């Protein structure tokens, strides 16, 4: 099947000063999304989209690279201040938060953990025996 040739949508550079960085750290991957204050996505990146495959996606280094990539895209839109919202139990979670704070020209306003916790809802999966 031939690739579709058409006009690609041009990325419009917005001038947004404040944003929110959502870090979703699962056991298998880390997804970083940068939004404006209204929740509209400005930039995103993940360990898998950067070329990490298999078990390498879940490493702290892959999470750090995903954050740096997403923040580089967001800086093109003028982001200077961000809040951080972290979700999930993944191994790349702490490294991702530290690497947001280490980026030059970005000021962190707040940090919040939004991991959903059940009030004794569904039964969890059985323990893994290796």
Curated annotation (Swiss-Prot):
Listed Pfam families: Ribosomal_S11 (PF00411)
Sorted UniProt keywords: Ribonucleoprotein, Ribosomal protein, RNA-binding, rRNA-binding
Entry function: Located on the platform of the 30S subunit, it bridges several disparate RNA helices of the 16S rRNA. Forms part of the Shine-Dalgarno cleft in the 70S ribosome.
Protein name listed in UniProt: Small ribosomal subunit protein uS11
Gene3D superfamilies associated with the record: Ribosomal protein S11
Recorded name of the encoding gene: rpsK
GO biological process: translation
GO molecular function: rRNA binding; structural constituent of ribosome
GO cellular component: ribonucleoprotein complex; ribosome
InterPro entries, sorted: Ribosomal_uS11, Ribosomal_uS11_bac-type, Ribosomal_uS11_sf
Record keyword Cell division present: no
Xref: HAMAP family: Ribosomal_uS11
Complex formation: Part of the 30S ribosomal subunit. Interacts with proteins S7 and S18. Binds to IF-3.
Ribonucleoprotein is among the record's keywords: yes
Protein family (similarity comment): Belongs to the universal ribosomal protein uS11 family.
């Amino acid at each position: 099947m031939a690739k579709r040739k058409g006009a690609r949508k041009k990325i419009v550079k917005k001038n947004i000063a404040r944003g929110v960085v959502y870090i979703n750290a699962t056991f298998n991957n880390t997804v970083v999304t940068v939004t404006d204050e209204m929740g509209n996505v400005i930039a995103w990146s993940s360990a898998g989209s950067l070329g990490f495959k298999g078990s390498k996606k879940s490493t702290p280094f892959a999470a750090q690279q995903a954050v740096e990539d997403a923040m580089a895209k967001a800086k093109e839109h003028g982001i200077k201040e961000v809040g951080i919202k972290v979700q999930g139990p993944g191994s790349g979670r702490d490294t991702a938060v530290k690497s947001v704070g280490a980026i030059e020209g970005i000021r962190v306003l707040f940090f919040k953990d939004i991991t959903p916790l059940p009030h004794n809802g569904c039964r969890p999966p059985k323990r893994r025996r290796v």
